[in-house]
Amino acid sequence: MIEVIVNDRLGKKLRVKCLSTDSVGDLKKVLAVQLGTAHGKVALHKGGVNLKDHISLDDYEVHDGTYLELYYL
C-alpha cells in the first residue's frame, strides 16, 4: 500500500492510498469521488508528463510519498 499526494494547484492537496499495481485510471476514479467530479474530467501529471489511464503506477515509478499534479479538463 502506498500513499500518493495529489496537488490540484488551486490549494487542494489530497492524500490517496492505493496499490502500486493500480492503474492511473483506478487512481483517477478514487480522486474523482473525493473531488465530486467525473474521472474523465481530470488529468494527472508527474514531472510534466501526462499519465495514461491504462498504465500502472509502478510503471510510472510512482512510489509512497510521490507528488502528482492534478489538472481539470
Swiss-Prot record:
Q: Which residues form the Ubiquitin-like domain?
A: 1-73
Q: Which domain of life is it from?
A: Eukaryota
GO MF annotation list: protein tag activity
Q: Name one GO cellular component term.
A: nucleus
* One GO biological process term: mRNA cis splicing, via spliceosome
Q: What is this protein called?
A: Ubiquitin-like modifier HUB1
**Which PROSITE patterns does the record associate with it?**
UBIQUITIN_2 (PS50053)
Q: Which organism is it from?
A: Eremothecium gossypii (strain ATCC 10895 / CBS 109.51 / FGSC 9923 / NRRL Y-1056) (Yeast)
**Is Ligase tagged as a keyword?**
no
InterPro entries under this entry? Answer: Hub1/Ubl5, Ubiquitin-like_dom, Ubiquitin-like_domsf
**Gene encoding the protein:** HUB1
Keywords for this protein: Ubl conjugation pathway
Has the keyword Endoplasmic reticulum been applied to this entry? Answer: no
Where does the record place a coiled coil? none
